[in-house]
Amino acid sequence: MQKLTILGATGSIGASTLKVVEQNPELFSVVALAAGTNVEKMVALCRQWQPKFAVMADKAAAVALQSEIHTISPNTEVLGGVDALCHVASLEEVDSVMAAIVGAAGLLPTMAAVKAGKRVLLANKEALVMSGQLFIDAVEQYGAELLPVDSEHNAIFQCLPQQVQTNLGRCNLDEHGISSILLTGSGGPFRYADIADLDSVTPAQAIAHPNWSMGPKISVDSATMMNKGLEYIEAKWLFNAARDQLKVIIHPQSVIHSMVQYRDGSVLAQMGEPDMATPIALTMSYPSRVDAGVKPLDFTQVGELTFLQPDFARYPCLKLAIDACYEGQHATTALNAANEVAVDAFLNNRLGFTDIARINELVLHKITASCKPENANSLESLLELDRMSRTIALEIIRERS
């Protein structure tokens, strides 16, 4: 029986993780559930799962949760705050930690799981985007096991030799005959829209992803293709890929989730229904496979598969992320922070859709002009850089409104 802590239990990844647990009750049990502020959803989860621990990142939300569940889940200990998140991520009795807290907020608890030597099911791409080499070094130092949950990275993982799968962040692709990794993305809801019309895109339109069911932040990131940019950075670290080994391709149908191209001309692709339960189930059961509750892909219903080059005029955020990836850790940390602030402002109608890229570019320019890569070589310096980038982004947004 594998015991789990689920960080981000009330989000879409958390829901899919619990779906896999429900499908395989003899294999998995839930020890701790953690979320941000959504007390209502957490109450429902505590009622159903009766976890040993329920944690809210927001301490006021933890107080509210305690008053709601003391009768329906009397044996659940309610905790609040970042330290509590780190505590349940590193519990001795826990085998695997689903790291699915969205954004920079997930870095510290994910790192706590790494330092406790856990099997870390990494859905929080921002942890790698923000901390890069520090994260990879910590995985090796503390003997943690890293498994990628993002559908694209999970697809790539499945197409790689076992020697690479068990040596993430340290592998040599060239030694294993791998010429390139092809990271696919749907292009989001605006891939065929007139670029001139993107200025007037509303939050409701941006979060309506054509293929995947996701939370609002990642849905907006998919619309700008910043999500693919962050995934590009994550792939660089996970697979130790050089710039000429990593490519982005738009694949509107989201049937092929990513591909690996080998030196001999072979291309291995992982395909399936666009359901996050599939990659989640693999990371939970690796190297075995379990029932994820996902219907099999019906090839007779797939129709055509199309592939396009990304248009950087349509997706400036993607270009920013790729360039930042090779500027240094300070650049990717700053870009991630700026983007979180800009997307939040857009979702709250304080910023236009195309302004997201403008804010990101301005913050990136200010940080890279004043900060050197060597200034981002510790967790403390990265968190300070994250804070500084958010402050700059907020100031720019205030000036524009």
UniProtKB/Swiss-Prot annotation:
Domain of life: Bacteria
Keywords: Isoprene biosynthesis, Manganese, Metal-binding, NADP, Oxidoreductase
Binding site for 1-deoxy-D-xylulose 5-phosphate: K125, S151, E152, S186, H209, S222, N227, K228, E231
Functional pathway: Isoprenoid biosynthesis; isopentenyl diphosphate biosynthesis via DXP pathway; isopentenyl diphosphate from 1-deoxy-D-xylulose 5-phosphate: step 1/6
Sample GO molecular function, one term: manganese ion binding
Keyword Transferase: no
Residues involved in Mn(2+) binding: D150, E152, E231
EC number, as in UniProt: 1.1.1.267
GO biological process, one term: isopentenyl diphosphate biosynthetic process, methylerythritol 4-phosphate pathway involved in terpenoid biosynthetic process
Catalytic activity line of the entry: 2-C-methyl-D-erythritol 4-phosphate + NADP(+) = 1-deoxy-D-xylulose 5-phosphate + NADPH + H(+)
Signal peptide stretch: none
PANTHER family cross-referenced by the UniProt entry: 1-DEOXY-D-XYLULOSE 5-PHOSPHATE REDUCTOISOMERASE, 1-DEOXY-D-XYLULOSE 5-PHOSPHATE REDUCTOISOMERASE, CHLOROPLASTIC
Similarity comment: family membership: Belongs to the DXR family.
Function: Catalyzes the NADPH-dependent rearrangement and reduction of 1-deoxy-D-xylulose-5-phosphate (DXP) to 2-C-methyl-D-erythritol 4-phosphate (MEP).
Protein name: 1-deoxy-D-xylulose 5-phosphate reductoisomerase
Encoding gene (name): dxr
